[in-house]
Amino acid sequence: MARTARRTVPLALVGTLGLGGLVAPQAARAAPRTADPLPAIERAAHPLRSTDPGGSTKDLRPMGRMVGDASVVGLGEATHGSHEFFTMKDRVFRYLVEEKGFTTFAQEVSWTTGLRFDAYVRGGKGDVRELVHKELAKTPWDTKEYVELLTWMRAYNDRHPDRQVRFMGNDLNYPEIGAELFDGVEDYVRAHDPGLLPRITGLYAPIRRLADGDTYMARPLAERKKLAGNAREALDLMKRLQPSAADGEFAVALHHARSVSQTSTIYAFPFDTPEGVKDGMLYRDRLMARNTAWWQRHTGEKVLLSAHNAHVGYESYDPRYPKMQGAFLRDRLGKRYVSIGFTFDRGSLMAQSAESEVWKPRSVGAATRGMNEYTLDKVRHDDYFLDMRTAPATARTWLAKGRLTKSIGTAFPDGPHKIRLAPSHDILVHLHRVTAAHRQSQ
């Protein structure tokens, strides 16, 4: 995306940021003296054998008990560009698939990209490295770690043809609204209500011509609002069809129409104004939660949802964004949604900067006194996790208070930000050191 568009269209930015780069860091303040939480955190901590997938998963069994009967588990990341966050997600997903009956890896990528990845892991043609680069080149996820995840998913499906794992994208369609979405809607209408087809194709025609996200966003706001109206009308017409309750083909076609409408709607927000950014980002988190819940209901299967900590959590650290995807999912699913957040003490990540879209390794020093990670890193285990809902009282009290915490999106430097860990997530994974992810182009 062009630099000017990147500054004036925060949705393309925030689509890969969490909330990083949008909030000014706050000065650290001396905390009042309280009971030392370290012994209580030590008692609650379960050590991790490794952050790499493969090998024994015995150390993850306590996490499995913490997850319980949840149908959707949100698994965050404290940066978008660290190797260990990618590999831990891969490792946890494999465990949840093999031991807890999960089948879907959902990600804050477009519905279009999700369809293409899902086709690949279920035996579709193509080279996985080229596919990932084509779909994710503008995002933090064009990485060798992501390729390895999709490679494992495909290999798993080769071994388990009767219970396959799936990939789902729950976000707006960027960098493009895939032609398969329009085709899916029009093909269904052609087969079931051909008299409606001319109206549907007429409504979609101008949106098809602007399916590329950057081209779309370069159009005047008035035109984008008109196109959003077209997409909403097409969705409303689809909703009026009367298929049988068991018509899975209709459910997918309807979601294609919903996804086109969601994308056209968010492209019609005035992202050159603070209020437009606020309203657009609230809409985005709501739609991601809705799409995830729809998929879980449609498939009847359990879902691991991968996103930044800010998007899988319950609290936002920025008052301009008062409600995030995790909070919307909790509203929809109650205790059937569980949020897992990450912290880390030091290390490196791949990130862009405010001046350049080039991805480079960036270093992050150890946490300083008064930060959440300063205390968390004193636990005797380098890498561990704990259930913040059931930790000893002293630990819960400490975890409930806001302190400066590392939370980094695509733009570096970023933060730290004042975050309350326990109100934000159910389970916390702390890693001593992280390293930069491996982009395919490097």
Residue ranges and their predicted role:
Residues 1-30:
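Secretory targeting and sorting signals
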Residues 5, 9, 31-442:
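Structured catalytic-domain cores with a bias toward divalent-metal coordination
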